[in-house]
Amino acid sequence: MQSLRAAFRRRTPIFLKPYEFSTNVFGLRCRYYSQVRHNGALTDLEYHRVADDTLDVLNDTFEDLLEEVGKKDYDIQYANGVITLMLGEKGTYVINKQPPAHQIWLSSPVSGPKHYEYSLKSKTWCSTRDEGTLLGILSSEFSKWFSRPIEFKKSEDF
């Protein structure tokens, strides 16, 4: 907060740095995202951009899929970086951002919990435990359930 006050006193435009403004019950909140890379990893700003783009693409794909299937007990909710996909008797998927770890976490009724980190080299979310990718595991599981190929496309922004 000190640096924000100092910027106002100096009349320095604070928008030269990557800030995110949001409102909550207590008023305006300002969050600064680091632009420093550590060991070739994503910066905070890059992580949020890529993770949000990924979740947006997944949400759009899930909505299209649920619209095609048309089952009333299937539902999707997407808010605050969390996708909750309820598939009735098949179970519930939860896909969410984990900003402190720069990861996306997947909770699947088929494969269980998994953590994914973004690879700058392959431009995809790779599992921290095996060779799988987020889009690959989702494609595999949904293709089996719906008995047809389901493809999750990457965002052009990646």
Swiss-Prot record:
Domain of life per record: Eukaryota
Entries under InterPro entries matching the protein: Frataxin, Frataxin/CyaY, Frataxin/CyaY_sf, Frataxin_CS
NCBIfam families cross-referenced by the UniProt entry: FeS_CyaY, mito_frataxin
Upper lineage: Eukaryota, Fungi, Dikarya, Ascomycota, Taphrinomycotina
Function: Promotes the biosynthesis of heme as well as the assembly and repair of iron-sulfur clusters by delivering Fe(2+) to proteins involved in these pathways. May play a role in the protection against iron-catalyzed oxidative stress through its ability to catalyze the oxidation of Fe(2+) to Fe(3+). May be able to store large amounts of the metal in the form of a ferrihydrite mineral by oligomerization.
Source organism per UniProt: Schizosaccharomyces pombe (strain 972 / ATCC 24843) (Fission yeast)
CDD domains according to UniProt: Frataxin
Name this protein carries in UniProt: Frataxin homolog, mitochondrial
Transport found in the keyword field: yes
